[in-house]
Amino acid sequence: MSPICAICGQGIAPADDSKEHILPNAIGGRRTVNNFLHGDCNNRAGQTWDAELEKQLRPLALHIGIKRQSGKTSRMKVTTTANEDFLLDVGGQLEMVRPVVTPTLLRNDERIDVTAGSLTQARETLKGLKRKYPKVDIEAMLARAESRRSYATGAINIDLSFGGPLSGRSVVKSALALAHYAGLPIEQCGDAVSYLRKTDAEPC
């Protein structure tokens, strides 16, 4: 008897099988199971249910530095109580959303001051400035760059709540995948299976 897909309820042929992370890779999951989801069902759930869960948990994943098995957690824009905009990066680090370019007209020439969140951002900014100011020597300016550490003036307010029909199904799918990994037939988990297969099912 062929295994049954937890989402669509159809048999899984060897060619249609897929590796499913018990916890989504996007939030640091490593262990996988087979004979649990069709490849198509796996992809659809990943693009909807798991994507929503990752979006809701991204602030926490960035703050504590979750390492994915593959890929990298995307930075996210945050605003402080002082209305400062930053990008939250891995480990809770903050980076400027956009660089600040300040041209100053001197007696014989024009001076350009660039404040950027990283050397990479500074380099990209200087490349853009070179189109307007061809005499800009990117490498010379980077060699004279000064590194300074500064802190946000305001506090960052991050919503760590999660739930809803999409991320909720991702959580239930993980619980069902763990049961499958432990050798429990998924059809014995009636409420969980019903929740994954029926859009109007009651949350379990």
Protein language model regions, located:
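Short, extreme N-terminal leader segments that mark the start of a protein/domain
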Residues: 2-7, 22
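Alpha-helical structural context detector biased toward long hydrophobic helices
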Residues: 2-3, 12, 26-204
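Short recognition patches in nucleic-acid-associated and regulatory proteins
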Residues: 14-26
